[in-house]
């Protein structure tokens, strides 16, 4: 709230399009330090909501105590959307300045959340730290400031919203039958609940990033964007985050083994219940179909993200006036198309003709055209 009032004092308006236009034209009446502090205030507020490591202290108890329906909303991605909508939209340059810190926190959050989930015996607390790990993946992707990383981050927001909803529905169904979230009270349920274990396995494999399912596409794009990002400085955080994929698969598969396989739990007299009902099948199978469709038909979904998602993420235009490697009369659209072509098709000389490629880029991608030694041909322009 303090940051919002401060921003109003600087701009004299709460209108988001006006604020964005003032930010992009550098007409906000404030020093760079003041704008940076204001952007950090917004980021901290949204980071608590996501949550971003180490601001996650509230998440475990909130998820463990809240009803399933509330948790499905609580574990949503409003914090991540807010970062894309407000921080990137109003403070694009300032967000890029703090990006290395957020990349590091994202990578640490992936590994930390996965390792803590490995030692949890409460299913809801395990799900809480799984939420932390997967939200950290999105943070890593969007703060790479590359097209592929940003697209992967937006795709992963959609993925985790669906996977999280399916997972918490399944936990609620399990609790409805047995009255506990403690994994030590379960075991050997696969023979009693074959359809339930099938849905659990599909959801877990999607969350773990199995190829041909939706989780793989998002994580692959994020790690690829992180690897190619100049903002990340080097590949250390990418490699570090990639280990979290292994730990993530470990705690998810370990949960399946403890709940549905092996011997009965500590209270075998309470092992009773029924498999999925017709209504529950209708609730869960659309999720499974979406996991597969988004994994196999990912180009279709990525085209939708390219068209609408990046606009929602407030991709800012770039001032290329200082770029002396291109002709002075090169238009911004031609520059963006040339940059996109060269990052998408390295080694090729694209024939754009003004229409064949999206005319968009991000501040972090400016690095890719600054080192060019020769002027582009007229055909390339």
Question: Model segments located where?
Answer:
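Hydrophobic transmembrane alpha-helices and their helix-loop junctions in integral membrane proteins
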Residues: 1-220, 224-257
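Cytoplasmic/organellar membrane-interface segments at the starts of transmembrane helices
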Residues: 191-195, 252-340, 345-354, 364-371, ...
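Soluble catalytic regions of membrane-associated enzymes that act on cell-envelope
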Residues: 357
């Amino acid at each position: 709230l303090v940051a919002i009032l401060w921003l109003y004092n600087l701009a004299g308006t709460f209108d988001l399009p006006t604020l964005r236009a003032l930010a992009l034209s550098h007409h906000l009446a404030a020093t760079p330090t003041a704008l940076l502090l204001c952007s950090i205030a917004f980021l901290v507020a949204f980071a608590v909501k996501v949550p971003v490591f180490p601001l996650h202290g509230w998440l475990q108890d909130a998820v463990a105590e809240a009803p399933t329906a509330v948790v499905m909303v609580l574990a949503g991605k409003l914090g991540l959307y807010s970062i894309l909508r407000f921080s990137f939209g109003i403070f694009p340059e300032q967000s890029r300045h703090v990006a290395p810190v957020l990349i590091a926190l994202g990578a640490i959050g992936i590994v930390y959340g996965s390792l803590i989930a490995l030692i949890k015996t409460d299913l809801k607390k395990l799900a809480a730290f799984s939420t932390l790990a997967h939200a950290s993946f999105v943070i890593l992707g969007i703060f790479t400031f590359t097209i592929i990383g940003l697209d992967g981050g937006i795709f992963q927001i959609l993925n985790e919203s669906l996977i999280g909803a399916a997972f918490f529905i399944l936990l609620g169904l399990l609790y409805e039958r047995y009255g506990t979230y403690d994994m030590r009270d379960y075991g050997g349920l696969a023979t009693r609940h074959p359809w339930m274990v099938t849905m659990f396995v599909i959801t877990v494999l999607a969350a773990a990033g199995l190829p041909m399912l939706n989780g793989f596409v998002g994580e692959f794009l994020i790690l690829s964007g992180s690897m190619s990002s100049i903002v990340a400085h080097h590949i250390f955080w990418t490699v570090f985050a990639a280990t979290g994929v292994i730990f993530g698969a470990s705690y998810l598969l370990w949960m399946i083994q403890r709940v549905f396989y092996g011997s009965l739990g500590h209270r075998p007299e309470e092992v009773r219940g029924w498999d999925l009902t017709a209504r529950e099948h209708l609730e869960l199978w659309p999720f499974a179909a979406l996991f597969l469709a988004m994994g196999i038909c990912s180009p279709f979904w990525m085209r939708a993200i390219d068209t609408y998602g990046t606009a929602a993420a407030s991709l800012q235009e770039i001032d290329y006036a200082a770029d002396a490697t291109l002709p002075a009369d090169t238009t911004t659209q031609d520059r963006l198309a040339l940059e996109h072509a060269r990052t998408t098709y390295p080694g090729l000389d694209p024939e754009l003709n003004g229409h064949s490629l999206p005319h968009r880029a991000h501040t972090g991608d400016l690095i890719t055209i600054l080192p060019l030694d020769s002027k582009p041909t007229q055909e390339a322009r």
